[in-house]
Design a protein with these regions (language model features):
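PLP-dependent amino-acid enzyme catalytic core
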Residues: 9-254
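Cationic, low-complexity basic patches in intrinsically disordered or flexible, solvent-exposed regions
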Residues: 3-7
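Short linear sequence motifs
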Residues: 1-2, 16
Length: 254
């Protein structure tokens, strides 16, 4: 059964997406940066949907940010893009290396979608009990799936990815989304700025916890803007919960 997406509630003005444009195939660092510029047009500035019927107070307004409008279909496109962009800029990721990471699915799909556009191969350590839909999408995007035990969850997948990166440093670029600062910075410099610009009176921000990048980056910047803003995180109440992508922080590796 497909698991529910993480709650991610904010308010933001809907902006019209520019039409897709073609670009010339190029190789090398310059070519990758050119392609990244093109891809960036389809990440961020996602629509805002009003949520009604959850309360009776007319003074309260709740909005859900439609992150599935991002390239690859989730909020994870923001972090994946920022990680890849900075890795290419620093020279750590080239067309001759394979991007490697652990994932429960959504970040992996973002890596694979972006990697396909860039001509960069992607290998993902994925718990064997991840939904078949996610596996099918990853395969269709050309990603290599390295199965890990369903009992170890993404924690074991992280350990496997780190092991492979250590054993084959010339083969892989280990993205390490759980420890990569470019994860939360994608939201600190992107998501949060959008919120502040479009909803200066925001009072609450709510997000689920996986890598914690969305919550940490967005809430950190919002708190700097207005310390009175309440940042609320959601997580499973038990260690064994079966929710793909969610983390029980007391027992998980983050």
């Amino acid at each position: 059964m497909q698991q529910p997406a993480k709650p991610f509630f904010i308010s933001i003005k809907v902006k019209k997406m520019s039409n897709r444009v073609s670009y010339k195939q190029q190789t090398g660092s310059h070519g990758l940066k050119h392609k990244l510029d093109h891809i960036s047009r389809f990440i961020g500035n996602t629509p805002l949907l009003p949520i009604t019927g959850l309360h009776q107070n007319k003074d309260v307004k709740i909005f859900a940010k439609a992150e599935w409008k991002n390239l690859s279909g989730s909020v994870k496109a923001r972090a994946a893009f920022n990680i890849i962009k900075n890795a290419i800029s620093s020279g750590k990721l080239t067309e001759n290396k394979i991007l490697l990471d652990a994932t429960s699915g959504n970040t992996g799909i973002a890596y694979a979608a972006i990697g396909q556009k860039l001509g960069i191969k992607v290998a993902l350590c994925l718990p064997e009990n991840a939904s078949q839909e996610r596996k099918d999408i990853l395969h269709s995007l050309g990603a290599e799936i390295i199965n890990t035990s369903p009992f170890g969850g993404t924690d074991e997948a992280q350990e496997k990815a780190a092991e492979l990166a250590k054993d084959f440093p010339k083969k892989y670029f280990y993205a390490s989304q759980y420890t990569n600062d470019n994860n939360w910075k994608a939201h600190y410099y992107g998501t949060a700025i959008e919120i502040i610009r479009e909803l200066p009176e925001i009072s609450h921000f709510v997000a689920g916890l996986g890598t914690t990048g969305t919550f940490v980056g967005t809430s950190r910047r919002l708190k700097e803007y207005n310390p009175a803003i309440q940042a609320i995180s959601l997580q499973p109440d038990v260690a064994i919960h079966g929710l793909e992508g969610w983390k029980h922080l007391e027992t998980a590796i983050v």
